[in-house]
Amino acid sequence: MYYKLEGRKIDEENTKYRYVFIDEITLLSDFIDTAAVLSDVFSMMGMKIVVSGTDSLGFAMANRDELYDRSVTIHTSFIPFREYARLLNICSVDSYIEYGGTLKMENMSFDDPDAAFDEVAFRDDESTRKYIDTAISRNIQHTLKNDHYGEYFNQLRELYEKGELTNVINRIVQHMNHRFVLRVVEDEFKSHDFGSAKELLLHDLPAERATVLYDVNEKQILERLKAIIEVKEKSETTVPITQEHIDKVKKYLLMLDLIVNCPERYESGKQAEHIVFSQSGMRYAIAKALVYSLMQDAYFASIPEADKAYITGKILDDVKGRMLEDIVLLEVRKTAPSTMEAFKFKFDAGGEFDMVIYDKAGQNCRIYEIKHSTEANEKQTLHLRDAEKCQIVEKRFGPISGKFVLYRGKDTFAEGVQYLNVENFLCGLK
């Protein structure tokens, strides 16, 4: 890399260069192992070197060795909602999720240009496959190929070479609780989104659409889904997966700020790991792939178009609802001052507050329910109005200074609970 830069006549005698910007520097095959020339040679000439690239792990590996303690890293993997809304002038959490947490939708749409704006009109699976593959797997694979002297992620090299790395990553991404444990990778594959949708639709009984997902060919649907997201059963893999493999994947994602641990708190006083994916597209792409697979089912194709739209919309809305909870919690934690903590709180007898914001300085707290709905209804405030649950929280975190429902509707107030528009709430975080 030194000689390539020398070829641009950047040397001690030519000091007119003060700022050097190099885009996609990680495309250089020797970047990881020769990055020190940027700090040891060129920065010593008084230059400021600004580099960028899509291989985030490559930067992390270079910072570990060649650039250790000599660089400042700014992650762009995570784009907060307020920045997305400001730059694109689109104040919609649904669009934010559908864009995949990025500033463009091209990797989340399908071949038909109209499909980008039609959640249920999928044409083929290539764009979803492309997004899932490029979001994480190709990133780590590129670094494994170019880290010639590295040992840190060598446990993943064999998985990469056998084409089985994406299987491990996507099994964890689609798991309801994103658990980094061996069982999640080794157990027979199940779609948590499909199972959740089956249960939700039963609330529509006696309507015929309530049981549609029990009548489709679930096995074939899951086989199609597995093919799209490159998931394999244990018997189909060649490399025995160990907990060490999974721990390395987790470490990698943490290094890149693609996952964040937002610990849950319990009435008993315990805390538990709660992994949140900071790039929403990693999760939403799999939900889209499930809907595409469902649309190919012969029985599903025979039901009324209105029912198709309702059911596929139900699947995606359910996923968006869970993702919205994570988005709000993550963004509040990232912007909260050191005197405040934000966390999900669970009760021993069942139920939870989606978010508690604890003001350690003022010794009080605010409690929140987070809903994807655009309509306010009494059910949304059930836990917030539960006197026993409120007493439990007040005993731990001081008086409750406010009760809130964050949703996609208009600001309003009812029965002691403030309804706030979630998009305005997120845009107001600083």
PLM ranges: what are they?
Residues M1-E12:
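Short glycine-rich substrate-engagement loop in P-loop NTPases that contacts/grips substrate
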Residues I10-I32:
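Conserved P-loop NTPase "ATPase switch" module shared by AAA+ and STAND
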Residues I25-V50:
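Conserved Walker B catalytic segment
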Residues V37, L57-V72:
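Short regulatory helix/loop adjacent to the ATP-binding pocket of P-loop NTPases
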Residues T73-L156:
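Amphipathic alpha-helical segments of the small helical/lid subdomains adjacent to P-loop NTPase cores
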Residues N139-F353, D359:
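Accessory nucleic acid-recognition modules appended to NTPase machines
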Residues V332, F353-N377, L384, K403:
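Conserved catalytic cores of phosphodiester-cleaving nucleases, focusing on short active-site segments
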Residues F404-K430:
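Domain-level recognition of nuclease-like catalytic cores that cleave nucleotide substrates
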